[in-house]
Amino acid sequence: MKIVVVGGGTSGLLSALALEKEGHDVLVLEKDKVGGLCRSENIDGYTVDIGVHAITMLNDGPLTRLLNNYARYIPNFREYGDYYVRTDKLQKIPVSMNEWMT
């Protein structure tokens, strides 16, 4: 069966992978860049995270089943420290909701 998946973000790509493994002919359509909001860009020599790059504390559900059954997922950890650059200054990455709000 020919199937079109609209959206090349995490969910779209995993869905397309699962459908292809089941023998379907899959076409993924993405209006921007593959990966959706889960990607990095190089801007003026800096690697900038565009969106989500970590999914933590996953409970058993559709996403974990797709990852476990169809993806050869090997975590890639990079040492960047606990800071990010904001207005030419290093800012500590907040670890709680209250810290994000201030």
Curated annotation (Swiss-Prot):
- Native organism: Methanothermococcus thermolithotrophicus
What protein does this entry describe?
Uncharacterized protein in nifH2 3'region
Which domain of life does the protein's organism represent?
A: Archaea
The record's listing under InterPro entries reads: FAD/NAD-bd_sf
